Amino acid sequence: MLSFILPLLLLASPVIGQNTSTCPTLPSAITYASNAKLPDPFLPLASPRLTTKSQWPCRKEEIRQLLQRYTYGQMPPKPSSLTASLSGTSLTITAKEAGKTMSFTVTLKLPTSATAPYPAIIAYGAASLPIPSTVATITYQNFEMAADNGRGKGKFYDLYGANHNAGGMITAAWGVDRIIDALELTPAAKIDPKRVGVTGCSRNGKGATIAGAFVDRIALALPQEGGQAAAGCWRIADEIQKNGTKVETAHQIVNGDTWFSTDFSKYVDAVPTLPWDNHMMHALYADPPRGLLIIENTAIDYLGPTSNYHCATAGRMAHEALGVKHYFGFSQNSHSDHCGFPKAQQPELTAFIERFLLGKDTNTDVWKTDGKFVIDEKRWVDWSVPALS
C-alpha cells in the first residue's frame, strides 16, 4: 500500500565527505557470535550501541570495511593521477598509479529541455527505466572494469594488478567514483557533479546499490530488480531456499561469477557468522543523506521478493534513527518482464528524480508492495530504532 505519511522535509544539502580518518580500523581477527537474525547496524564490533548521531560516521566506516573484507574486496582511493578529456559526447577518463595507466570512456546524452549544468544519471550498461528529458544520461560500460569470464581481467586490474582482491562489483563502484572525478574536472561536459544518480538492473542493480553505498557523492541510487546484494539479505534468502523456493543465495552467487572477492566464498555456507547483512549496506545511504529508491518485482521468485521487502525494511530503520526515513523508498510490483518498468512504479520514480536531482520540493515517503507474503518483522529484527541525540 502506497503511503505518503511523514511530513515533507527540505531537500538534502549537497553531499559533503565526512572525515573518518580518526575512526578505528577493523581488528585483524573478528570474533562474531553466529546470529540467524539481521545484525544490529547501531552496534559496533567493540563499542556500546550508538546513542548519538555523531557516532554514526565511524560506524558507517566500520560497515564499509566489513563489506570490503568479507565480500567485495578493497576499493582503492582516487589514483595518484587522473585526467579527463571530452570529445563530442565521449568523456575519456585516464588514471595512473605506480607507473601503470588505464583509460575508459563513458557516453553523455544531454537533456533536450533544461539549463546547464545538468543533473545526470549514470546507467550501468544502459538505462532500463525512463530517464526524463531534463536529466542527462551517462552510459557506463561497467563490465570493462572487471570481466565476467575470468578473475583479474579488465581495466581496473590493468591499473592495480591481476591479483588485486577486488571483485567486479566494487571495481565498478570505483569506476563510478572516477566518473564523478572527471565531471568535476570537465565543466565543458555541462554536468553538475553534485547532482548525479546511478541506476542498473539485475546484476547491475546490485552494482548500482553498491556504488551508491560506497560513493557519497552519488545523490540518488535507483537499483532495479537486483535481488540479493541489492535489496535482499543473505540470511533471509537462505531461509527461502531452505523452504523450497529457488532463490539467489550467497552459496550460489560465488559459483562462476567474479562479482565478489574470493574471500566471500569462505562464508557463504555459514551466513549467520557474517557480522553484517545487506540491510547495513542500505544504512550507508542515511548520512550524509542521499536518495535511495529500490525498484523490485514480486513475480520472479529468484529475486527473493520476501527477502527484498524484509531486508529493505530493516535498512530503513537506520534512516529513521537519523531522521531521514523519507530518503529511502521501496516499490515492489508484479510483472513478468525482468528489467521492464511498469507504469505503476512511475510516480515514485518521478518523485525521487525530482527531489534528489531536480531540486523540487517533492514527497518521497514511498513504501509499497503488492506481495502477499506474511510481514513479520520480529522474525528477522530483534533490535529497535534508537533515539539518537
Question: Model features per residue range: what roles?
Answer:
Residues 129, 145-147, 205-208, 228-233, ...:
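Flexible loop/turn segments at secondary-structure boundaries
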Residues 179-244, 269-271:
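Primarily recognizes the serine-hydrolase "nucleophile elbow" in alpha/beta-hydrolase
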Residues 18-105, 111-116, 280, 288-290, ...:
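Alpha/beta-hydrolase-fold serine-hydrolase catalytic core, especially in secreted/extracellular enzymes
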Residues 178, 199-201, 223, 261-298, ...:
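Extended catalytic-interface subdomain
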Residues 120-123, 136-141, 197-199, 219-224, ...:
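Structural recognition of the beta-strand scaffold that forms the well-ordered cores
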Residues 220-281, 304-312, 318-324:
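Mobile cap/lid helix-loop segments that gate and shape the active-site cleft of serine hydrolases
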Residues 123-187, 227-237:
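Cap/lid segment of the alpha/beta-hydrolase catalytic domain
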Residues 1-18:
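Fungal secretory targeting signals
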